[in-house]
């Protein structure tokens, strides 16, 4: 990856990190006796493989080697030809809003060693970003700053039981490709955490994952539903809060098929990394298995997170997979969220991306062991089935999957895509059975069309504006669209004032007045909105390339700036003050 160079602001950042760490450690000592084993402060970078006292470079490359005689993994700078795993990080966040991570493993070593080493080397090149992302987003979750003891103990017990059940399944099904991939996923996470903590030791046989360690960085989506299922009473999710917009668009004459996604999130999550993994994993645990179809992948992500979480993936199998969150508003369904018999969503999406070569297979793999957490509408685009300039193949180009607790519905939507020329996704289920079961009918009855599939603001804006998409640039413009002060479709009739920054393809809830009146929480002023856009095409996906812009939209509204915003007091380590970045083309050597 060739990117602009970026140097960390050494002394200022160091002071901020020192203050935050000191406070975290003091509070950890105060609350530790009351709530053992829960999350909180993690050590600042400076483990045995870190360069103590040095400002981290804008670009860093490292390799993990196997010392056969000593039976140990060793870290060296640069890319070594005999590496078990290697990684290169280019930090261009100050220039583009993105860091770029490229990571690969060697098929000369077994899958388990590759997976663990992949986690080890990722932490080694990105430890400063991991620390800052943790402090920005996770340090307050279940201590030491603030916590809800009953909920946190229930969450810890749930995760421990779930990890134990998965360990039992891995041991009971040693020949299973599915459980082989689950094990590799957890080993990669184990390597990431061990490396960051400076205690690398490849686990032979059974191994453990801390329930509230770096697992929390993977769980941000699953936690949205675990909080409700486990009766968290403080700081519940905002009713109606959007989480991503997506558009799949056939260009005129079926000349191309564009796939676009923007992530909606809290602005403290804007330390962003676009990652490329090239993992030489086999489908099953034995050497005669072929490589997984999705062994090459590019995805938008975050420091310390080994999957997308947005989610947006371009896969070497010819698939592009993405989702928007639909959630669950029916409390009666939380009974299906159980620690045993389920695999949490972040793991299932990794496994499906690796093993599937078409949409139907992806759906079959993903829906196994439905956890009922991180409930999403998934779109699986298969570019292998798309014929540029040709008629509809009838099937396989677009598969739609929707998950809620106790239910997964799948359908091929290729014919509908070709009939309408687009598929839009905006956090509302498209399947009537899912819509009704998830409790949205009651919200429509209470609040009107804002919660309906056809009448919500984004449904109407997509329907009106999708025909304006003629190429990559116009797709980016639509996905960054927010003209809430002038667009009648952005009005909230029950709000005062009526124009609302949430009612757009890329939300800017920070622009809503703090003293306004709003019928539900999502329409209020919040440090939340669309924080990126990613777009690919048939030709770009073939080479794992995309266009990407980072940060809240600033096309029709002022750019977001921390120092002048109502949220300047929120921790945002490592982030630029002013978010005003143009799209960049992401390509790889």
UniProtKB/Swiss-Prot annotation:
Disulfide bonds: 142-152, 492-495
Glycosylation sites: 88, 110, 231, 436, 465, 515
GO cellular component, one term: extracellular exosome
Keyword entries, A-Z: Disulfide bond, Glycoprotein, Hydrolase, Lipid degradation, Lipid metabolism, Lysosome, Signal
Signal peptide positions on this chain: 1-41
Tissue-specificity statement: Ubiquitously expressed, with highest levels in heart, brain and liver.
GO terms, biological process: phospholipid catabolic process
Main location: other
Pfam family for this entry, one: Phospholip_B
The EC number(s) this enzyme carries: 3.1.1.-
PTM section of the record: The p76 protein is synthesized as a 80 kDa precursor which is then processed into a N-terminal 32 kDa form and a C-terminal 45 kDa form.
Localization in the cell: Lysosome lumen
GO MF annotation list: phospholipase activity
Entry function: Putative phospholipase.
Xref: PANTHER family: PHOSPHOLIPASE B-LIKE 2-RELATED (PTHR12370:SF3), PHOSPHOLIPASE B-RELATED (PTHR12370)
Family: Belongs to the phospholipase B-like family.
Subunit structure: Interacts with IGF2R.
Name listed for the protein in its UniProt record: Putative phospholipase B-like 2
